[in-house]
Design a protein with these regions (language model features):
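Phosphate- and other anionic-substrate recognition elements at nucleic-acid/protein interfaces
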Residues: 1-122
Length: 122
């Protein structure tokens, strides 16, 4: 596990250096079926937060229900619905794999909520 966390950290740093984002969006930890899975997810989130902090990036967190609602229109959508809607929203040629769809869903959620709040500020 330490090697995978290091690989994640180094990969995130490369992405941050290349893409130069202003902020980072991540999913809040959902403690569901397995405490072990939640612990591993928490460790990965910690690495993402650390890499973001190193570059002074604001980290915004969204709950799974917020993400699903932003992508599908309802907070209790299933994974298949999220994957399909990501394909539609982003005009992809095929449905992305589960992990990629999850990451893209967080990005879509963040983008939608940012656009909404920007309009409210005007």
């Amino acid at each position: 596990m330490p090697e995978r966390l290091l690989e994640l950290y180094q990969g995130l740093k490369k992405v941050i250096q290349r893409a130069r984002p202003n902020e980072v969006a991540i999913e809040k930890v959902f403690v569901g079926a397995s405490a072990q899975s939640a612990l591993k997810l928490g460790q990965a989130r910690g690495v993402a937060i650390l890499a973001s902090a190193e570059y002074n990036l604001e980290v915004l967190e969204y709950s799974p229900n917020q993400i699903k609602k932003a992508v599908v229109g309802r907070g209790h959508a299933d994974k298949t619905q999220v994957m399909f809607m990501i394909k539609v929203i982003l005009s992809l040629s095929e449905v992305p794999e589960s992990d990629a769809a999850d990451a893209l869903a967080v990005a879509v959620c963040h983008s939608n909520l940012n656009l909404s709040s920007s309009k409210l500020e005007r």
